[in-house]
Amino acid sequence: MSDLVVYGSYGYTGTLIAEAATERGLDPVLAGRERRSLESQAARLGCEFEVVALDEPKVLDMVLSDATAVLNCAGPFARTWKPMVEACLRTETHYLDITGERTVFEAIHDQGDRAADAGVMLLPGVGFDVVPTDCLAAHVAQRLPDADRLELAFRAENGVSRGTAKTMVEHVDGGGAVRRDGRIERVPIAHESRTVDFGWGLDGQHVAAIPWGDVATAYYTTGVPNVTTYMAMPERAVQLQRAAGLVTPLLSLPPVRTGLQWLIEQTTEGPDADERERGESYVWGEATTADGERVVSRLRGPHTYALTVETALATARRALDGDAPVGFQTPAGAYGPDLILGVEGVEREDVV
């Protein structure tokens, strides 16, 4: 049995990760509930595979019993984190995933004491959600230790995979969220907007507030009590987001949600190899003190899915090598703000 289990290895992102892990000699065990998909993938990659659903705890324990770490790539993570984390606690297996779901970060954080007692690391969010933003949050907070406010923004050039689109539908009625005085507060979606200079020719970019995972994680990484996260989008898109908030009760009805999930299954595939090769991502971070002192830093990196593969495998390799601080962790909390600089093509610069 390999030291690394990749669960949900045949989804869009899971496939990219499984392929890269195999190419780099990690020899992962591929796992999930769909036998036909696993058989085909395992034959192509030359890997072992295990068919196991998350509602089969005894089988799941057997799959994880000889593993050092599991990388959960099966979303929506609101449905998958709990049975997998429970299995990790029972089998003393380190847990990593690629979620960006704020509520999932909070829920896994609540298991931190149990994980520490079991000698297990719980490290959600090891993809684009939230490694680059978490690392930049840690960096600007390190530059300004007395900061009491963090603002983070990102710009991504990509389509989305089926799994990401389904997760968006799963949370369509969640609205927005910010952290104020250390507590997460619900707010209307896109309730704030501003312009940001992402650098590299992308100045004056319009961004709007969204409930990115860093609303949860940045506080645990830095201790800064006020956090707002933004995504680049045209002003027209912001207006549509705000208008959509008026119909979210309709969108959250089970028949409507089921219809949206079906439509995604029929129409969404994710960026192709050329798009992943050419695309770039940008992150901007600002830390501010109560008396107005501020610092600004930013970074540029590969396409979001390409970056996810790199950061997921970098953190998994650290765990496999024994560098796995126990309890709940964030990427930069576990491995420092320079973790992201280990990804080829990432540049970081301090602006203010």
Label every model-predicted segment:
Residues 4-24:
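N-terminal Rossmann NAD(P)H-binding glycine-rich loop of SDR-like oxidoreductase domains
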Residues 5, 29-30, 96:
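Conserved beta-strand positions in the Rossmann-like core of class I SAM-dependent methyltransferases
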Residues 7, 142-289, 293-296, 306:
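Active-site-lining helix/loop region of Rossmann-like oxidoreductase modules
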Residues 31-35, 53-54:
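N-terminal Rossmann-fold cofactor-binding loop
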Residues 51-67, 72-80:
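Conserved Rossmann-fold cofactor-binding substructure of NAD(P)-dependent oxidoreductases
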Residues 62-66, 78-97:
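Rossmann-fold NAD(P) dinucleotide-binding segment
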Residues 98-120:
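Rossmann-fold NAD(P)-binding glycine/threonine-rich loop
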Residues 272-352:
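C-terminal helical cap and adjacent loop that interface with cofactors, partners, or active-site loops
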